[in-house]
């Protein structure tokens, strides 16, 4: 089960992105998370996805 808290979720996903070397799209897909909804949630909470570094960051 994924963390519901946005900060914990970002930490979890960044760890998976780094350790498992996968794309955000694939990681969200295997965890049954809608990409567009997730990107909106990131934005609402002051985060963005840095494609060059494959990492979720604070705005």
Range-by-range predicted roles:
Residues 1-23:
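N-terminal acidic leader/helix
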Residues 22, 58-59:
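Charged low-complexity stretches with an acidic bias
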Residues 29-58:
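Short, charge-rich amphipathic interface segments used for partner binding and complex assembly
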